[in-house]
Amino acid sequence: MEKREKKNDSIFQHRLERHHDELRWLYMELYQNGDMFAELCSQMYEYYNCRSKKLKERDLKREKEPDWYHGKDMLGMMLYTDNFAGNMKGVKEKIPYLKECNINCLHLMPFLDTPKGRSDGGYAVADFRKVRPDLGTMKDLIELTEKCHEEDINVCMDFVMNHTSEDHEWARCARAGEGEYMSRYFFYDNEEIPEKYEKTVPQVFPTTAPGNFTYLPETGHYVMTTFYPYQWDLNYRNPRVFNEMIYNFLYLTNQGIDIVRIDAVPYIWKELGTTCRNLKQVHTIVRMMRMIAEIVCPGVLL
């Protein structure tokens, strides 16, 4: 047991050493916060340790075959769990059918917990660590990914980075006036800054959800809502937001996810006087995510 732990530690340390300097440089460029970077590295080690033996073996294999996803035999299927099979267990039962279709990449459309009637098709996430109850549980997801892996099927999911649901724990605390959580979003107590953003930021849904801000009368603040009023934009200028979203990302990959489609990523960095689309900081954040994945879960494709 001790030898195995030392081997695992050495694998992690080797990967960390390979990326540490660039990762730290990029992190400090955005955040200038050494304590938060140290916390990030510590948590990366914890999530690596929580990764199952089978997933670690899968990582090692894919490190040796980094172009595993380039094969001409790769064939994917994208589906909504409820429409296809009712729930996660139903999808698991239909794996023989997927094999008959020669499917080796299964893209599950958003399945995390969302508020009923305000879900935006699953893209208004209320809890990044909970499956929507009618679809199953995290245990069901793990059982599905394990069975898929046994049948050489990769599992893909969407990771919503730009925003959370207004029902997310952070948003509820922010609505209650807790400054720590208000700083994780874009809150303004008057129209001055929102109006400046509106001059340069295009509208995503000008007909169904006009504008990029929503006024909350109970707090007396405007909150940035690029998509729908119930989807609050996260403030990636706050290192706590970046760190916590990375922890959510690593938690999900530890459930057996092979491929992560980052949703709405062009929007995640906001800068007054710009369109707030595809800014250079977005690419810095995605690069850091890729390096973190290569350290903790290199078998996962972004």
Describe each model-derived feature in a short phrase:
Residues 1-237, 242, 254, 265-302:
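Acidic/aromatic-lined carbohydrate-recognition and catalytic surfaces
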Residues 258:
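Receiver (REC) domain switch/active-site residues of two-component response regulators
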